[in-house]
């Protein structure tokens, strides 16, 4: 039976694949029959992801993408790609007044500069096939709303969204598509590692019309959609996946 979302025969790079959304994307891509290349900094957790992948021909490469030399070496090792899911990033809640220069540098280095340099190197080394698809994992903080403590994180994602739209124009003549996926709150297990009470969670959930937080699979399947040929006429867009949060 024909599956319009199939990634059969496509080679897809997923960054930040050692846990959470990145792991879910990698698994989903392998289930859609892609040849998956995963990368992250943590060797043990990346191996755990690798063991969950389906199919043959998958590859794992340890690399810290915030290190420009490691990033360059990674790109040189890669075959031609049909898709990129750029997921590596960090979340930091910091009030601007008490933040330091190093905080700004680290957040932008990982959330903004690393994905930009990745695509820069892929293009310069001719690693993207014609009609390839690039998907950046951004956030609703990048396109919609501010939050106390979110000035640095939100602006790092807003910069990525701006880059994505301009890049989409630059590479359109080659049929390469560029989009972002912008999730709201996704339960990646982080609530199990915090002191947030059940009452606090229930109060926060009132901000979501669909009455739940996102699942990693919600985001992974959206990325599959944008990587697949189904979305071949979609570029330069930001896909908000937030349970209706931004409607309020």
Predicted regions and their residues:
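Short, small/polar-rich loop/turn modules that mediate ligand/substrate recognition or access, typified
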Residues: 172, 177, 234-236
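Conserved glycine-rich cofactor-binding loop
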Residues: 18-19
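Residue(s) in the substrate-gating loop at a strand-loop-helix junction
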Residues: 139
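Short C-terminal tail/terminal secondary-structure segment
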Residues: 2-3, 224, 235-248
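Alpha-helical segment proximal to the catalytic Tyr-Lys
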Residues: 124, 165, 169-170, 232
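Substrate-binding pocket helix/loop in short-chain dehydrogenase/reductase
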Residues: 95-108, 204
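Active-site helix of classical SDR
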Residues: 119, 156, 164
């Amino acid at each position: 039976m024909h599956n319009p979302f199939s990634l059969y025969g496509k080679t897809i790079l997923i960054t930040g694949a050692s846990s959470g959304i990145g792991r879910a994307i990698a698994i989903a891509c392998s289930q859609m029959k892609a040849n998956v290349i995963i990368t992250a900094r943590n060797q043990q957790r990346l191996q755990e992801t690798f063991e969950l992948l389906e199919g043959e021909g998958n590859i794992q490469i340890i690399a810290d993408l915030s290190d420009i030399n490691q990033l360059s070496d990674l790109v040189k090792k890669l075959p031609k790609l049909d898709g990129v899911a750029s997921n590596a990033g960090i979340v930091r809640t910091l009030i601007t007044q008490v933040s330091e220069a190093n905080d700004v540098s680290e957040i932008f280095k990982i959330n903004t500069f690393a994905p930009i340099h990745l695509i820069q190197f892929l293009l310069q080394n001719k690693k993207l096939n014609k009609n390839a698809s690039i998907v950046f994992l951004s956030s609703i903080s990048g396109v919609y709303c501010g939050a106390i403590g979110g000035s640095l994180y939100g602006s790092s994602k807003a910069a990525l969204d701006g880059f994505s739209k301009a890049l989409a124009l630059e590479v359109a003549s080659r049929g390469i598509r560029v989009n972002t996926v912008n999730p709201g709150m996704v339960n990646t297990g982080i609530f199990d590692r915090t002191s947030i009470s059940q009452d606090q969670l229930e109060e926060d959930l009132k901000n979501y019309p669909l009455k739940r937080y996102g699942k990693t699979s919600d985001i992974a399947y959206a990325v599959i959609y944008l990587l697949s040929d189904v979305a071949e006429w979609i570029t330069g867009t930001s896909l908000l996946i937030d349970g209706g949060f931004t409607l309020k």
